[in-house]
Amino acid sequence: MPHFRLLAMTLLVSLTVVGCAGSQSSTTTSRQPNVVFVLTDDQRWDAISISGHAGPLETPNIDRLGHEGVYFPNAFATTALCSPSRASILTGQYAHAHGVTDNFTEFPADTATWPLVLQQHGYETAYVGKYHMGENNDEPRPGFDYFATHRGQGQYFDTEWRINGGERAVIPGYYTTIVTDLADRWIRGRSAERPWAIMVGHKAPHSFYFPEEKYKDRFSDVQIPYPASAFMLDDKPDWYRDRLPTWHGIYGPLFDYRKQFPDRTPAGVTAFEEMVRSYWRTILSVDDSVGRLYHTLEEIGQLDNTVFIFTSDHGILNGEHGMIDKRTAHEESIRTPLVVRYPGLTAPNAPRVVDRMVLTTDFAPSIVDIAGIEPVAGFKHGRSWKSLAQGQAAADWRTSYVYLYNYERQFPYTPNVRALRQDRYKYIRYPNHTPEHKSELYDLQDDPNELVNLIDEPRQRARVAEMHGELDRELKALGAWPDVMPLDEGIGQELPDAAIR
């Protein structure tokens, strides 16, 4: 351990020297803008206080980006799973197109990404934090001049890091603080004469939730009721109930509060409350991180010449619909927080809310557009939201989007999901029409918590047929896999099978 600590300190000291050597004036230049892209893991759309739905959770630094920029309340993941979503953010493609369809598949090195395109157009680029495409691969990836990451998920304390393919070493401390230190030092080392872009990949708020020491008791006096949908499963597909005692169900072993159904015992409620509190606590540290990077940009005179993006790969179900997971097409799973600060989009004293649907696949075309680079053909499933963020009308903007998830043998608790989400209605279907895989229809305006499945309502038959047909047409246009692929082998065990990762 002393060897690793010495190496870790050497790495951090060397970064500090680079940062000092690259100090610059506080004058913002007129060149292409820098990019700071902060990506959290499993953070729900309502887990930032600017959403108005965060309860006692306050995120003033994240909110500030929206209050001085653009807030997108209707941002969505095309696949609510870590690796596929991260690949979609980089490539502007759905998972079946870029090939990363689970959490153990390597990202294809020959696929264009927005960092690679920026690098090819003169940007200096960096990735710091959780990359999570390739379970045990921490080698540098194409498109990044500087690459600091680790294998797999990393851990909240004392993660083993690898910088630019060098020797692995534990950097002692809390993950969110360390990743911010690394990002801060790299940013301070950049020249004011050359544009740069950095992605900052947080572990938080991914489970298991281990908060920073200073926040470990926050929210302890907050009572948190079970979500209204936790026990309202009668009109849902059978697989909802089948997964209750599994790794991704509220009575499974993941958070160790398996009781009778429904469980309203004091022990069960306390365990649920503490899970949600700890989830929020990890986000407090992320908010601190955003504040640090904001002030760094101020100090080096690059705040107003930087596109500062904050988002997540997808959301998470914290007990809703009886689930502790993402993957599904529920709002808590597919909606993401998204705020963007850049005066080239809107002045800091004239913030804007853009209600249109934007997707993870829109990041790649949007960022290259803002950088003044020609559109990239490979970013084929997304659209630039630059004009929307600037307040321009877009009559032809999407009014619906397709959500896709593909069954995983490693985590066999969710079937293939194909869904069409419109502004008001959502239609979800599974591989077949047995009770186990019963389809779903929700009125998001009257029933935002998706409590009442309207699929069997006679008055909704025409709507179901219409949305079913639209989903078919969109899936064909995307070149997506058939509903029955990959083959669904069903729920075979309550714990994931590590042997087939």
Predicted regions and their residues:
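Bacterial N-terminal signal peptides that target proteins for export
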Residues: M1-M9
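Bacterial N-terminal signal peptides
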Residues: A8-G19
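Formylglycine-dependent sulfatase
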Residues: C20-S439, P448-G469, R473-K476, D483-M485, ...
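Residues forming the ATP-binding cleft of Hanks-type serine/threonine protein kinase domains
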Residues: Q445
